[in-house]
Amino acid sequence: MPVLHNRISNDALKAKMLAESEPRTTISFYKYFHIADPKATRDALYQLFTALNVFGRVYLAHEGINAQISVPASNVETFRAQLYAFDPALEGLRLNIALDDDGKSFWVLRMKVRDRIVADGIDDPHFDASNVGEYLQAAEVNAMLDDPDALFIDMRNHYEYEVGHFENALEIPADTFREQLPKAVEMMQAHKDKKIVMYCTGGIRCEKASAWMKHNGFNKVWHIEGGIIEYARKAREQGLPVRFIGKNFVFDERMGERISDEIIAHCHQCGAPCDSHTNCKNDGCHLLFIQCPVCAEKYKGCCSEICCEESALPPEEQRRRRAGRENGNKIFNKSRGRLNTTLCIPDPTE
């Protein structure tokens, strides 16, 4: 039986990937379909992906598959053919090709079985996830943006919305998708006569969200096929105006794809226009936040002076200070991106 998980350190794998001369293509895809045995499917796909030198993050569950991967350019068509042949449900599956891609998005393959491919918190036995809203193509999206009876709902996290979104799109203020679903229903109760257009990065969240809205009595529900990635690609190919403003946040090493030239976010430390996410360099924090080049130099890549000072300590002292600390210094609240200069150690009652 071959080894069906990685045994090499992350640092070694990253160095190996960066030394590669062959270009890579970043691809994302998902499919809601019944998988009878997710563990066996996971093992078979792991062998297929490994044979083609595919890196990335893949989740499988009884409800389907969700993947963000990096494929050697020379293997893309072979990968496509083998994926389509793997299961009849995957034949012809849309593969979202990254828009702004240096091919260095992943350097290890992680494939996990989960309860859901998207953590939605739905436990209603009568919910039909297949009863989704209507798909919208790029030209239809632009038409809806000009329709006064249409409301665009962003089903991504705050830090994603913060750096880029469709014109006049509504943000659902929540930290997770499972929190967003009931809030979306609540916020839209007064707008049941409107056309509800839902979107996300690649389509997986908004597809399920559209079904949830219909389950809760909303009849005029659409969602963007392929999400932001496919919309921007098709709009450019068809010579249409791209109505997404800013950057599309992505969950890999790139942390974002440039869609338009506008910078709509600001540095969390000084307030200068900036939409570059980074993780705090302090190993006891690693907070995701927005930092401009000036502040990156000033704080040495850290989110605060406290983290800057702590990251300069000897490794043993850093480890001693991290002991018993659950979530780093929490100088920022990740969900809303607000600076809090008074809070150093988390309040256990929060």
Swiss-Prot record:
InterPro entries: Rhodanese-like_dom (IPR001763), Rhodanese-like_dom_sf (IPR036873), Rhodanese_C (IPR022111), TrhO (IPR020936), TRHO_N (IPR040503). Disruption phenotype: Deletion mutant displays only slight reduction of 5-hydroxyuridine (ho5U) modification at position 34 in tRNAs. Cells lacking both trhP and trhO show complete absence of 5-carboxymethoxyuridine (cmo5U) modification in tRNAs; cells display a temperature-sensitive phenotype and decode codons ending in G (GCG and UCG) less efficiently than the wild-type strain. Pfam families: Rhodanese, Rhodanese_C, UPF0176_N. Keywords: Oxidoreductase, tRNA processing. Changing residue 201 to A: Reduced 5-carboxymethoxyuridine formation. The gene is trhO. It comes from the Bacteria. The keyword Ribonucleoprotein does not apply. Changing residue 206 to A: Does not affect 5-carboxymethoxyuridine formation. Belongs to the TrhO family. Its EC number is 1.14.-.-. This is tRNA uridine(34) hydroxylase. Residues 146-240 form the Rhodanese domain. One of its GO terms (biological process) is tRNA wobble uridine modification. The keyword DNA repair does not apply. Gene3D superfamilies: 3.30.70.100, Rhodanese-like domain. Induction: Is expressed at all temperatures, but accumulation of yceA transcripts decline with raising temperature. Thus, its expression is repressed by heat shock. SUPFAM superfamilies: Rhodanese/Cell cycle control phosphatase. The active site is at 200 (cysteine persulfide intermediate). It is an enzyme of class 1 (oxidoreductase).
